[in-house]
Design a protein with these regions (language model features):
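Carbohydrate-active catalytic/glycan-binding domains of CAZyme proteins
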Residues: 20-351
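Bacterial N-terminal signal peptides
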Residues: 8-18
Length: 351
């Protein structure tokens, strides 16, 4: 081997080791059976399921069976100007959507924010179809539904979920950290808060009931610049409400997402005989006091699982959620699991 070859070899090794030392890794190839997603939610249009998730302009996948997925573009090619004007630091990476079909119209709710701040807003766009090949396919943005303002609001306007009650009333639950999960009544258009406003607290993590987050990413540590930089230690987010039998069930995610092998994300649930609560867990502890019956928690392969949605397939219910997968270098991947109910009416899944 010549000196030139040795020099080239050691140069290559140096670059590889340097890249490894800096934590550089390639994004995994698209896996149709377990695609990389954060914060999944899905709805069926015709014979096709469409999945929406966090991403630039809101990422979309499609599937005939909730099993094998393929990319289906994104919702926004042009970002809503109101969001750019309202939320400093928002540049199009749109979080935690929710999808709803009501009276022939699809409503897509979405979150505009930046990590660790509660200067945030929830918007909504509508469409007559989810099929991009249809001549009726066109997303029409309806603007801001609700926003949170730093220094004014001890809650965070992200992670929306809209539930239509049996009387036709629309309710939006939302929240992440700060004061926890809130519920507000929507007007008949499902695009604005109803007046007079009705607000209900649903879930929070009082001191001593949540994991200590004080030593996590700098972006979410307390900061003297004000409440916008102090989410507190109340790790709860991602509400999702379903009705089963005579009960309303509130699913939320507790503890820490997005930490790779150190993720502690989990899904818990409480139930109530009213959509407005109070929600309690199987032991009778209110979710407003940090209660929650565990539905899904981490294991050796998936240390953190959370941000769930529930869909009805006609043959039962499926829970969609994301998990940090050891086999993909702890990238967030989609899990789809059967939602089972025990004889006492409490849900569970098998990872």
């Amino acid at each position: 081997m010549t000196l030139r070859h040795l020099t080239a070899l050691f140069g290559t090794l140096f670059l590889v080791l340097a890249a490894s030392a800096q934590g550089i890794r390639r994004e995994p190839a698209f896996n149709p059976l377990q695609p990389a997603v954060h914060d999944p939610v899905a709805a069926r249009c015709g014979d096709t399921w469409y999945l929406f998730s966090t991403g630039f302009g809101i990422s979309v996948l499609s599937s005939p069976d909730l099993k094998s997925w393929e990319p289906a573009g994104r919702v926004f090619d042009t970002l809503p100007q109101w969001a750019l004007d309202t939320v400093p630091g928002y540049h199009g990476h749109t979080w935690a959507p929710d999808i709803l079909c009501h009276e022939g119209t699809y409503y897509l709710y979405y979150s505009c924010s930046s990590f660790g701040k509660n200067t945030s807003a929830i918007g909504v766009a509508t469409n007559r179809t989810l099929d991009p090949s249809s001549p009726d396919y066109r997303w029409e943005d309806k603007g801001c539904v609700i926003r949170s303002v730093a220094g004014r609001d001890n809650w965070n306007a992200i992670d929306p979920n809209v539930f239509i009650d049996t009387d036709g009333t629309g309710w939006m639950s939302f929240g992440s950290f700060w004061g926890g999960i809130k519920l507000v009544r929507l007007d008949a258009s499902l695009t604005r808060i109803a007046e007079p406003q009705e607000w209900f607290p649903l879930c929070r993590r009082p001191e001593g009931t949540a994991e200590d987050t004080s030593e996590t990413d700098d972006a979410i540590k307390a900061d003297p610049r004000g409440k916008d930089f102090d989410p507190g230690n109340g790790a709860v987010e991602a509400p999702f409400i379903v009705r089963h039998g005579d009960w309303y069930y509130l699913f939320v995610s507790y503890d820490l997402c997005c930490r790779g092998p150190k993720s502690t994300y989990k899904v818990v649930v409480g139930r109530s005989d009213k959509v407005t609560g109070p929600y309690v867990d199987a032991a009778g502890t209110p979710l407003m006091e940090g209660g929650g019956t565990v539905v899904a928690s981490g294991n050796d392969r998936y240390p953190g699982v959370g941000h769930c949605a529930v869909v009805s397939t006609g043959e039962g219910e499926k829970m969609l959620l994301h998990a940090y997968d050891r086999e993909t270098g702890y990238n967030a991947v989609l899990l789809t699991r059967t939602l089972a109910w025990d004889r006492d009416g409490w849900p569970s899944i098998q990872l």
